Each structure stands twice: as structure tokens, then as C-alpha cells.
């Protein structure tokens, strides 16, 4: 989960998770 205020799901699986412009992004 990206946390509160962050929507969407990660297209890539990774350990680093960031919330950019309210969207969830994962990085390997």
C-alpha cells in the first residue's frame, strides 16, 4: 500500500514505493 491520500496500484513490483501526484508508483 502507498498510504493515505494515494490511489492506484503499482504496475511494477519493487521495494521502493512512492506517491507521485496522488498516484502509486513502485520501483525495483
Curated annotation (Swiss-Prot):
Q: Does the keyword Disulfide bond apply?
A: yes
Tissue specificity field: Expressed by the venom gland.
Instruction: Kindly list the cysteine pairs connected by disulfide bridges.
Output: 2-19, 6-24, 10-26
Site-annotated residues for Aromatic residue of the functional dyad: 27
Q: Which UniProt keywords apply?
A: Disulfide bond, Ion channel impairing toxin, Neurotoxin, Potassium channel impairing toxin, Secreted, Toxin, Voltage-gated potassium channel impairing toxin
Q: Which GO terms describe its cellular component?
A: extracellular region
Residue ranges of the TM segments: none
**Record's subcellular location:** Secreted
What GO molecular functions are on record for this protein?
potassium channel inhibitor activity; toxin activity
Residues covered by region (Interaction with Ca(2+)-activated K(+) channels): 17-24
Q: Where this protein primarily resides, as one coarse class?
A: secreted
* GO BP: any one term: envenomation resulting in negative regulation of voltage-gated potassium channel activity in another organism
Q: Where is this site: Basic residue of the functional dyad?
A: 18
Q: What else is known?
A: Negative results: does not block Kv1.1/KCNA1 and Kv1.3/KCNA3 potassium channels.
Q: Supply the domain comment.
A: Has the structural arrangement of an alpha-helix connected to antiparallel beta-sheets by disulfide bonds (CS-alpha/beta).
Q: What does this protein do?
A: Potent and selective inhibitor of Kv1.2/KCNA2 potassium channels.
Q: Identify its protein family.
A: Belongs to the short scorpion toxin superfamily. Potassium channel inhibitor family. Alpha-KTx 13 subfamily.
Protein name stated in the entry: Potassium channel toxin alpha-KTx 13.2
Organism placement in taxonomy: Eukaryota, Metazoa, Ecdysozoa, Arthropoda, Chelicerata
Amino acid at each position: 500500500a502507498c498510504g493515505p491520500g494515494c490511489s492506484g496500484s503499482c504496475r511494477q513490483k519493487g521495494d521502493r514505493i512512492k506517491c507521485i501526484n496522488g498516484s502509486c508508483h513502485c520501483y525495483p
